[in-house]
Regions:
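Anionic-ligand binding patches
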Residues: 2-5, 12-192
Length: 192
């Protein structure tokens, strides 16, 4: 089994990565790094830079992830600024922001970047959803997860999904094509 370093301290992200990669012969090793992220509006540039900064610290091939949200009615807000907005905004703030807006579509963009110092590849998956009218579920790390439903999750908020049996989360990701599946397909065809 090949080792793959994943720069994350997020247990849920790690579980998802392992559930997709390990059946394909990739052992995912979590490394919790403090990486300063550049600011900007292009998430691909940000995740590429993040991967290179992680590689400089680890000196091994590494994967990083980043997620962004685009609220359609707000012309893509918060986009690449999602991490900061999640820190500043509560779920009630998101609901107030969307008050009176009919188009409540949101697109969650998952990004992965892999680099070995020479080759850097970025993978992206878009997941449609919507911002609901009242918070449901609980998520202390990201309260806004209580106001977002993913189209494929039968009307449940992200928080409600994560409140359920967490083992089922990894099963869902094994079945649903996402950014990790795309990465594994590429990696198997392009690594030594």
């Amino acid at each position: 089994m090949k080792d793959l370093y994943f720069a994350t301290g997020n247990k849920e992200k790690m579980q998802i990565a392992q559930s997709v990669c390990e059946p394909q012969g990739l052992k995912v090793i979590s490394i919790d790094l403090d990486i300063d992220e550049i600011q900007g509006e292009d998430p691909e540039i940000i995740v590429r830079d993040k991967a290179m900064r992680a590689f400089e610290k680890v000196k091994e091939p590494v994967v990083v992830s980043d997620d962004t949200w685009d609220i359609v009615a707000l012309k893509g807000f918060p986009g690449a600024y999602m991490k900061s907005i999640n820190y500043w905004f509560s779920s009630d703030d998101f609901l107030r922001l969307m008050h009176g807006i009919e188009d409540r579509r949101i697109i969650l963009h998952q990004y992965l970047a892999y680099t070995d110092g020479n080759v850097t590849e970025v993978f992206r998956n878009d997941i449609p959803g919507k911002i609901i009218h009242k918070a449901r579920g609980r998520n202390d790390k990201s309260p806004n997860m209580t106001v977002i439903e993913i189209d494929s999750d039968n009307g449940k908020t992200i928080a409600e999904i994560f409140e359920q049996d967490k083992d089922k989360i990894t099963e869902r990701y094994k079945k649903r094509r996402d950014v990790w599946h795309e990465f594994v397909d590429w990696y198997k065809n392009n690594s030594n």
